[in-house]
């Protein structure tokens, strides 16, 4: 899901080394839930962090050398081990959350990933055909309790000639940026083009953008669905 923002709203939340990468004069912020399946370079699974729900809140940036990429405001994941490795090794703002994701590319709720006592953030039982349900509630480090619940209906696949410049702008990104204190890092990513499907948001109660300091504009967001592709992530490098 993607929302347009005034560039000044987003720029105020970026490090000075990065600038908003605008499309038709607007900054864009995306909320992206998905299932993460982790493997080593040789294709081995990682037992303590192999398959789990994850979601990120991100925007689109360009550095001082003109290289385009993604800046993450937050990355919520249901595996504490994966969160610790990503925070320490990649300096990315990973957070441990109770998460559920079900539907065409989702996972049933699993022990250790559910929200525990109290109201469940979702999903509710029995998603319909072509429907995804997702829920999360942040555990650590905070702001604790930041949550999201959504339901998305999936439509027909896009043909290549039906995709426009904005679709490519939002999905074709090859560099991730992070900054922790004085350390600024860029991480290269490579993947095939995402196969995209039409999607419609049927229900959305989101607090993850608000936790990042952003209030979505009124109206329905632009939405895509993808069954996914393999993504290779490089080592962190200093970018400036």
Question: Which functions belong to the PLM regions below?
Answer:
Residues 1-41, 194-204, 217, 225-228, ...:
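N-terminal domain-onset segments
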Residues 56-240:
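Internal, well-folded beta-alpha domain core
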Residues 24-27, 32-65:
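Long, hydrophobic/aromatic-enriched structural stretches that serve as scaffold segments
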Residues 21-25, 43, 52, 81-83, ...:
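Short, surface-exposed linear patches
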Residues 1-8, 43, 167-177:
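Short N-terminal helix-initiation segments at or just after the protein's N-terminus
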């Amino acid at each position: 899901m993607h929302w347009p923002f005034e560039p000044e709203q987003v720029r105020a939340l970026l490090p000075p080394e990065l600038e908003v990468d605008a499309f038709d004069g607007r900054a864009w912020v995306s909320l992206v839930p998905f299932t993460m399946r982790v493997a080593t370079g040789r294709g081995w699974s990682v037992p303590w962090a192999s398959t789990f729900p994850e979601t990120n809140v991100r925007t689109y940036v360009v550095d001082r050398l003109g290289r385009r990429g993604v800046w993450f405001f937050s990355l919520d994941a249901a595996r504490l081990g994966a969160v610790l490795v990503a925070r320490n090794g990649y300096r990315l703002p990973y957070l441990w959350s109770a998460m559920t994701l079900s539907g065409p590319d989702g996972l049933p709720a699993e022990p250790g990933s559910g929200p525990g006592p109290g109201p469940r953030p979702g999903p509710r039982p029995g998603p319909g055909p072509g429907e995804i349900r997702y829920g999360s509630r942040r555990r650590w480090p905070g702001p604790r309790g930041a949550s999201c619940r959504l339901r998305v209906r999936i439509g027909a696949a896009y043909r290549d000639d039906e995709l426009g410049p904005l679709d490519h702008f939002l999905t074709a990104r090859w560099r991730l940026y992070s900054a922790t204190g004085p350390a600024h890092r860029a991480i290269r990513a490579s993947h095939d083009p995402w196969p995209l499907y039409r999607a419609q948001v049927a229900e959305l109660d989101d607090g993850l953008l608000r936790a990042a300091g952003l209030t979505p504009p009124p109206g329905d967001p632009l939405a895509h669905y993808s069954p996914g592709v393999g993504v290779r992530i490089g080592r962190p490098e200093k970018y400036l």
